[in-house]
Amino acid sequence: MASGHNQYCLGYAQVKHHEWRSAENSSNHLLPKLQVIVKDNPKLKLLDVGAGSGTISASLARYMPEGEVTATDISDEILARAKDYANSQGVTNIKFQNANVFELPFPDSTFDVTHAHQVLCHLDAPVDAIKEMMRVTKPGGTVSLRESDMYMWCIWPEIPALLKFHQLQIKNIEGKGGQGKGGRQLLSWALEAGASRQDITLSFGTWCYSTPEDKKAWGSAMKDRSLTGFAREKAIEMGNATGDELDEMAKAWEQWLETEDSSLGIMNGEALITKR
């Protein structure tokens, strides 16, 4: 990212659980609006900022077969993974570009829709990022945002080590300059970025991990994050957890995965901004 701004604070190596995400389970607030836009303008241009593994980008592209999606991220490695995913799904109306959300390499008023999912919560200056997304969006276009509220996890059973893991995620993201309460702050950020209240539609949506398949996508990734990699190293370095505590958290995620009635719900703030 640009000098003076923090990067994605959890690292890029352990993002397998991101590939569970789709337009349907992670950008559902945008879909009715997108379908209306596609009907009126089949060849629309959509920018996906911080696309990561590209699963949402590819599923959005299916809703606009005559349009074009530009998927961006600051990691060439993750963009290569996103391109491979799109190719595997037969999605051809998508291109990939390394880009920094604070300095998007596009002219003013380029895109009909600008989309960002779980991007602002990792940034130290989310309002500046929204301003930049609004800049590249056409007048009358839509900026779509969805951000987790890290404080709003509902986990069962309440295994003590998992409750500690939840608090650790908050400490890690906020300790690196991110936004633990991003979901509930979207309206405030959008207003500060210059949008008028009547041009902002706010909602809240959830993720639910309760089926064996969904739980595996999340729980296995959190177990791995506890055992190895960048997130573990940073947690220890920042003094937020010890190695032994992280090992206990990994065991707790294994227990959660093996428990038939376990579940996890996470609240997300959602905003649609009309650019004027």
Regions found by a protein language model. Give the residues of each.
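Class I SAM-dependent methyltransferase SAM/SAH-binding core
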Residues: 37, 44-49, 53-103, 128
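A short acidic, Gly/Pro-enriched loop at the edge of an enzyme's catalytic core
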Residues: 102-113
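A short SAM/SAH-binding and catalytic strip from SAM-dependent methyltransferases
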Residues: 112-126
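C-terminal helical/coil "lid" or tail adjacent to the Rossmann-like core of SAM-dependent
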Residues: 2-9, 167, 199-264
